[in-house]
Amino acid sequence: MSLCIKLLHETQGHIVTMELENGSTYRGKLIEAEDNMNCQMRDISVTARDGRVSHLDQVYIRGSHIRFLIVPDMLRNAPMFKVGPGRSVPLPTRGRR
C-alpha cells in the first residue's frame, strides 16, 4: 500500500477538502476511505465551480474523480513520516522547504 493511501486512511474521522475533476470542492468529515480512494463523507459543504455553495448530509465519491485532497495539518506528525530504523533519510516530499 502506498504512502498516499496510508495517509488517506489516517484522515478517516477528520475534516478534509477534496477537489474533483469537474472543479467542485467538497469539505466535510471523511467517514471511510477505500484503497482505490473511493471516499464516504458526512456533513459536506459543496462549492461548485461557479461559486454556489450547498450542503449535503452524506456523499460517496469515486476515487478516480478526485483531483486532489487537503488533509489536516496535524497529520504532518503521523508516525509514517518519522525516520525509522533502517531508514536514514525522511521520505521525499514535493515542494519547497
Swiss-Prot record:
InterPro entries: LSm4/Sm_D1/D3, LSM_dom_sf, Sm, Sm_dom_euk/arc, SmD3
Location of the protein in the cell: Nucleus; Cytoplasm, Cytosol
Domain Sm: 3-75
GO MF entries: mRNA binding; RNA binding
GO cellular component, one term: catalytic step 2 spliceosome
Domain of life of the native organism: Eukaryota
Gene3D superfamilies referenced in this protein's UniProt entry, alphabetically: 2.30.30.100
Biological-process GO terms, alphabetical: mRNA 5'-splice site recognition; mRNA cis splicing, via spliceosome; spliceosomal snRNP assembly
Keyword terms of this UniProt record: Cytoplasm, mRNA processing, mRNA splicing, Nucleus, Ribonucleoprotein, Spliceosome
Function comment: Plays a role in pre-mRNA splicing as a core component of the spliceosomal U1, U2, U4 and U5 small nuclear ribonucleoproteins (snRNPs), the building blocks of the spliceosome.
Assembly and interaction partners: Belongs to the 40S cdc5-associated complex (or cwf complex), a spliceosome sub-complex reminiscent of a late-stage spliceosome composed of the U2, U5 and U6 snRNAs and at least brr2, cdc5, cwf2/prp3, cwf3/syf1, cwf4/syf3, cwf5/ecm2, spp42/cwf6, cwf7/spf27, cwf8, cwf9, cwf10, cwf11, cwf12, prp45/cwf13, cwf14, cwf15, cwf16, cwf17, cwf18, cwf19, cwf20, cwf21, cwf22, cwf23, cwf24, cwf25, cwf26, cyp7/cwf27, cwf28, cwf29/ist3, lea1, msl1, prp5/cwf1, prp10, prp12/sap130, prp17, prp22, sap61, sap62, sap114, sap145, slu7, smb1, smd1, smd3, smf1, smg1 and syf2.
Family: Belongs to the snRNP core protein family.
Protein name: Small nuclear ribonucleoprotein Sm D3
Gene from which the chain derives: smd3
